[in-house]
A protein has these predicted regions:
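Short, Lys/Arg-enriched N-terminal segments with co-localized hydrophobic residues
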Residues: 2-19
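Glycine-rich, acidic/polar active-site loops that bind/position phosphate-bearing ligands
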Residues: 18-464
Length: 464
């Protein structure tokens, strides 16, 4: 891991930062003119992590960068009520990029926005503002939060109503094949991402048919959340240009593993990796151990956020390399937290891997609750449980109970029940998002419960 480059709290370099912000605004305006940009898309997300956008002309951009652009917040589910509809989108010029996919009507660019109330205060329903607030809490303790995700997804033929998903290949882990459409799509996606300033570390074919993984290089949490939103759109855009459907649904196929988004986490203090201790047997500092302990203690509470769909829990089952048990170990992929063994002497690479999240999550909210859980462990001095280095999938319930190893929630309903009682999650998300999220996801669960599935028809229709 590299030392942090972006800090979000107040500091003595305010004037210097203002000057840098002004320079970035000038760069954006100059680039728009030089590249012949015809439209600038202002991006933000709703509470569930769906990417939203409206476009402005270059003539409006300078005003937007200075004062923001108003829009009707009541048109975004979970944002505003009709009687208090208007909100303000203020572009973050650090996120400006020209979109690399071709548009016959002219070049387009995008910039992420922070959403504010009209009086200039942060808007409670903006997930990006929620993450910034939680990052500020880390800064007050002297930490910068870094993340590197391993993002899995599937390519399918264009879906037809009533038909099962049709994979494009039957490959497995690390398969090297002759030229095929899925591999070509992955390569083109990587080129697209790097054109947009999103560096890629690894990419390969995953275990399931037509399943692929792209791992992004670590960066600060806010930049990474923006990058994940861009990543999901880029994967879909590239696939759609070739009449292929890309999906981040956690478990689209039964009988094979689902798609996860393992998160490699670290804290930096100044230029030092706060998770590293060369004198420790695991090279883990007390800070790292308390952070891990916080994640383990609050894991069940944050699972509804990191795994927010009904379908998410069909991935979190034994036998498919997804975590089920709340435990940690070095290089053991059956637990919730894995501690990768870095190359010898590489203090910067010391990190932990949190393995339960899936790529359907809202990264701004997921990073917020993960950070809040870890910081709670640090602030209150939580003790890290004993390492569970056995294959947990092969252990009996009795043996797991002896080790006091609990399970993650087994359904969205279970996860919501636990989340609803969590003071930590309520504080991390804020009252508005916390309550709206629970209402929305309760409605999703009720809708799911009324469905009669093919499994039930095949099992019961003839026999009962």
């Amino acid at each position: 891991m590299c030392p942090p480059v972006r800090i979000y709290g107040k500091n003595r370099h305010t004037e210097e930062m203002s000057e840098m912000l002004e320079q970035q605004r000038e760069y954006v305006l100059r680039t728009v003119e030089e590249r012949g940009v015809r439209l600038v898309r202002l991006w933000f997300t709703d509470i569930l992590g769906n990417l939203k956008s409206f476009a402005i002309s270059p003539a409006e951009l300078e005003n937007a960068l200075e004062d923001g652009m108003t829009f009707d917040g009541s048109s975004i589910e979970g944002f505003s009520r009709v009687q208090e509809a208007d909100v303000l989108a203020i572009p973050d010029p650090n996120t400006f990029e020209v979109l690399p996919w071709a548009d016959p009507k002219g070049t387009e660019a995008r910039v992420f926005c922070n959403i504010h109330n009209l009086d200039g205060t942060p808007f409670d329903a903006d997930p990006r503002q929620v993450l910034k607030r939680n990052l500020d809490a880390a800064v007050k303790l002297g930490y910068a939060f870094y993340i590197a995700p391993d993002i899995e997804y599937f390519y399918f033929a264009p879906p037809q109503k009533g038909e099962l998903p049709q994979p494009l290949d039957e490959g497995g882990f690390f398969d090297l094949t002759t030229s095929d459409i899925a591999t070509s799509l992955r390569k083109e996606t990587i080129r697209t991402l790097e054109t947009m300033g999103i560096p890629v570390e690894y990419s390969f074919h995953e275990d399931a048919p037509s399943q692929h993984e792209i791992d992004l290089r670590h960066t600060d949490a806010l930049t990474m959340a923006d990058s994940i939103m861009t990543f999901r759109l880029a994967v879909r855009e590239v696939a759609a240009m070739h009449n292929v459907h890309a999906t981040f649904m956690p478990k689209p196929l039964e009988g094979v593993q689902g798609s996860g988004m393992h998160l490699h986490l670290s804290l930096f203090k100044g230029e030092d990796n706060a998770f590293y201790d060369e004198k420790d047997a695991y090279n883990l500092s007390p800070t790292a151990k308390s952070f891990m302990a916080g994640l383990l203690r609050h894991a069940a509470e944050i699972t509804a956020v990191t795994n927010q769909t009904v379908n998410s829990y069909k991935r979190l089952v034994p036998g498919f390399e997804a975590p089920v048990h709340i435990s940690w170990a070095r290089n053991n992929r059956s637990g919730l937290i894995r501690v990768p063994v870095p190359k010898k002497g590489n203090a910067m690479a010391t990190r932990i891997e949190y393995r339960s999240p899936d790529p359907a999550t809202n990264p701004y909210l997921a990073f917020s609750v993960i950070l809040a859980a870890g910081l709670r462990g640090i602030e209150q001095g939580y003790t890290l449980p004993v390492e569970a280095d056995a294959n947990l999938f092969e252990m009996s319930d009795a043996d797991l109970n002896k080790l006091s190893i609990e399970q993650l929630p087994q359904s969205l309903a279970d996860a919501l029940d636990i989340m609803e009682r969590s003071e930590l999650v309520a504080s991390a998300l804020g009252e508005h998002i916390f309550e709206w999220f629970l209402r929305n996801k309760r409605a999703e669960w009720r809708g799911y419960k009324t469905q009669v599935t093919p499994f039930e028809l095949n099992r019961y229709l003839r026999s009962l």
